[in-house]
């Protein structure tokens, strides 16, 4: 079987690795670097990728950076006289990685394992897979970045039982995952994150500060000058990296712009203390996902054996200090934060080819999945942090008599109401035979594959007719929406609960009206008009309350109707029981006549009841 390469497709940098024997090895690019900038530029129709593209970013406006942040969206970028999708630009980076991996291996590479942030949604995962396909790669598996890192860290520790926390702060995204390692099984217990937090944000804080300082001194706003802004970005990134090793750095940008008196230069120094002050709020934002992941995993800090740092941004001293303070543990530095994800992806490639034995990877889905049900409620079928691959089915029914079709509205999120979650897709199951509401049995099945990609099937159990949808990338969530979804879920918990209670009450009222009308019809001419009239009066009162929309009135009238309907049902039951008893007495008398000598026997009859 041909080699399966492991690719870490990052926001700012990417890396490629391959399994050689039992060891994962990073493949250096043609310039001798072990990571490659995720930058694409165009010059005279030529596509330039990596270090060369990054070097000319200042002078070449046809340069595209951080394309990963647009994956899963319909947003396009303009360059080279045309518009490109994020998948196409990502494919150019993947092609470059694939090309130099082939040069190193001396053979054609057709398969890859590609990593994504743990908090990437269905659309973003599908977009990543599509980018691989465009690049000529068969994507064997999409693996979460923290999980891949744990795989690289834990491969030689499969005989130990450990719980590890992976803190992954990359160029554009932040993830925390809790894993349990033991007997070769890598089991993801929980994952949390912030898809709008990464090294780019730290750079931006420095850029904003430099722009502000220059404006104070010279009265010129550099943020409106594209070329100056790119130079500031490069300088901010370099200063950030310098401050991981020194306590102060010099920023020198000659001829940054021109004023009335001639050229102007930017000369300043940035201390680590000032950098920490500028980025304090970003470091604070890393704490909530750590606590969330621990809570979801049902673990306390004392139960965590190791803390692994992943991503270049974890080299920032303030970030390391925050991790120590939050976890009470010294982070494990045995893995290279820039390379460990690609190495883990290559190991997963080895698991697929059979070169790595006795290793099982159990990943999770980051957000709940479900459908919209009556009243706009979001009914979850698969909860977040469920181990994948997984499949879950639930039977639903129609909401109206003789309903010929049902709309299946597929959603992803954590809010109780469908409108507050993100639509993944919609489809229809048609040709349902005419039947009263509640009779047709519609089975909805959610299936998440090993890559976290969702397909949904609806099946009429009566006719066996079914309809399936595989969620396409243009219908997925954006990073911001996922982040907002989780925050909104916490902030709006009380309001959500109230709205759900209202919908539940309305559904209950609707059901009570339907069943009572049916009972009144069934009891016509059966001799208990008093109870029927009382139930009808209570039913009319409830219908009026339903029309008014007054929830308190609906609740009171519903209780009254339930009481009257129960009395009517009891009469019906008593009548049926009396008829049955009379019939049994008749049969008993006949039996006694035919065999008067038999005096024994029991009055208790054993019966089987089938629950429907």
Curated annotation (Swiss-Prot):
Keyword annotations: ATP-binding, Chaperone, Nucleotide-binding, Phosphoprotein, Stress response
Its job: Acts as a chaperone.
SUPFAM superfamilies to which the protein is assigned, alphabetical: Actin-like ATPase domain, Heat shock protein 70kD (HSP70), C-terminal subdomain, Heat shock protein 70kD (HSP70), peptide-binding domain
Family: Belongs to the heat shock protein 70 family.
Coiled-coil positions: none
Protein name, entry field: Chaperone protein DnaK
Chaperone found in the keyword field: yes
Chain spans, region Disordered: 576-612
PROSITE patterns per UniProt: HSP70_1, HSP70_2, HSP70_3
InterPro entries: ATPase_NBD, Chaperone_DnaK, Heat_shock_70_CS, HSP70_C_sf, HSP70_peptide-bd_sf, Hsp_70_fam
Induction: By heat shock.
UniProt keyword annotation of rRNA-binding present: no
Bias (Acidic residues) ranges: 603-612
Pfam families: HSP70 (PF00012)
Residue positions, PTM Phosphothreonine: 173
Compositionally biased residues, Low complexity: 576-594
Any one GO molecular-function label of the UniProt entry: ATP-dependent protein folding chaperone
PANTHER family: HEAT SHOCK PROTEIN 70KDA
